[in-house]
Structure formats: C-alpha cells, structure tokens
C-alpha cells in the first residue's frame, strides 16, 4: 500500500508536467469518455468477454489485432505514463482537476517487455470499464477482459480451432507475432476458451519453464521491439513546445526529467 501511494504521488507529479505542456501549447486536453456501453456489470467471466467485445465495437476496432495500444488509449484521452517500478506492473488512476473533468491515467512499468506492457495496458483499461459484482474477483475479471480485448475469441478460434489436443511452439510463435502478446498469455487464453484442456496447458508450461521463458528476462522468441509500447505523446508535445519556442531547452529537459545533454542527444536522434 505504501509503494502504491508513493507511485500515485509520482504519477500525479508527472501528470502535472503533462498537463502543463498541454496548457503551454494552449491545447485542449483530450478528455476520457467511457465507451457507450460502459461500465459493464461483470457477474462472471463471460461478462468480461462481452465487455471487451463491446469496447472494441464502440471504438470501431473490429476484430483486428491492435498494433499500438498505448497510442490508441492516448487518442481516447487516457494519459499513459511509463515509470521505473519495482513491485507493481501498472495501475490506473483518476486525478481530479479544478474546473475540468478528472484526468484518467494508466502507469506502466518502463522495464517490462512490450508484450507485457500491452497486456498490462489492456488489464488497466479493464479496471476502468468493468463493474464486478456478486463476489467476482476484480483482478481475474480485468485479466480476462485484457485477454479478450487483445485476442478476440472468434478470431483465435478461427486461427487455432475449437478443440485441440496440443498446440506446437511454432504455431504459438506465429500467433504471438499476429496478436502482439506473449506465448504464455496466448496459452492461458486458449485454456480459458476451452481450446486446450488443463493437461495440454500443463505440458506447454513445462516446456516454457525448461526453456527459461517463465523467469526474467523472459526471453521468448520473436519478442517485439522494447520501445513499441512506450507512450510517446508527452515527449512529442515537449519537442513541439521547444520547436515553437514556447519553452527553452532547460525547461524542456526539466519537464522530461532528463539532463539538457540527454535532451540534445534525443533531438539529434529525432533529426537523424
């Protein structure tokens, strides 16, 4: 609880910098609006599946894989912050503001691999759009929402089949590249949907453990680029404010939480 409170304080501090840049650029902050069908009452895991399907429908996403989830959520008015975290993979928060609607924030762990970041983003989105009832475990419901949001049931069944005695590692790697999720998340999803049974699930996880995929640094094959799900909007706004001479280099570096030298190096990379 203490770590979560400290993390929330850091997130609020970073959010204030984010909103400052928007104000300096005289931009109207994109406000979070609940999807039309939310909040979804979740009395069992099927309701979590339905919630994910409804959010995709409300946002016009169809059943296609989502290429960049952090970018999509920022377009929807959620501020995505990437911080160095220890014990926590992520959290969602609502920060009240004077004279404006509350800002919605999702914090993700900077050092996580991209597939994990994507799942955590979808999990935290789940917390924002579902309303568990009847003793349903909220974490499990958010997890199920995340799996359904990133790997729609109909698409996965069409790709894999409805009932399988086993799935090859090669097949899982191909599906991982298609959906942008970890092999382990895919295997859990196949079990949740009844595509594989508990015995097949256990056999696969034994192979994952033997290959070292179950422990840090989680070196699965065909892992996505680490920066793919790093939020980019705040940094872009800082560069824009600098280019428009709204702020100087020292202020831009301060807002980004880096040294002027590091800022210069980043600007050189952007220009290259």
Predicted regions and their residues:
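Active-site hotspot residues in diverse enzymes, especially metal/ion-binding acidic/histidine motifs
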Residues: 1-272
């Amino acid at each position: 609880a203490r770590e979560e409170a400290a993390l929330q304080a850091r997130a609020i501090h970073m959010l204030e910098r984010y909103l400052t840049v928007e104000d300096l650029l005289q931009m109207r902050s994109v406000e979070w609006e609940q999807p039309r069908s939310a909040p979804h009452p979740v009395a069992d895991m099927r309701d979590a599946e339905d919630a994910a399907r409804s959010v995709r429908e409300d946002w016009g996403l169809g059943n296609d894989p989502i290429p960049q989830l952090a970018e999509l959520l920022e377009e929807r008015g959620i501020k995505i912050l990437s911080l160095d975290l220890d014990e926590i993979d992520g959290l969602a928060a609502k920060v009240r503001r004077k004279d404006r609607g509350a800002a919605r924030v999702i914090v993700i762990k900077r050092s996580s691999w991209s597939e994990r970041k994507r799942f955590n983003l979808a999990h935290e989105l789940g917390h924002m759009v579902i309303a568990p009832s009847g003793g349903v475990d909220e974490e499990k419901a958010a997890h199920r929402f995340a799996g359904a949001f990133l790997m729609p049931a109909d698409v996965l069944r069409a790709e894999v089949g409805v009932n399988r005695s086993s799935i090859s590692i090669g097949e899982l790697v191909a599906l991982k590249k298609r959906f942008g999720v970890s092999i382990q998340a895919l295997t859990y999803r196949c079990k949740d949907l009844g595509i594989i049974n508990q015995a097949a699930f256990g056999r696969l996880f034994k192979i994952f453990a033997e290959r070292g995929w179950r422990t840090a640094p989680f070196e699965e094959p065909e892992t996505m680029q680490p920066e793919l799900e790093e939020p980019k909007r705040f940094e872009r706004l800082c560069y824009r404010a600098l280019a428009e001479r709204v702020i100087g280099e020292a202020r831009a570096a301060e807002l980004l939480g880096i040294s002027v030298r590091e800022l210069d190096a980043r600007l050189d990379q952007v220009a290259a």
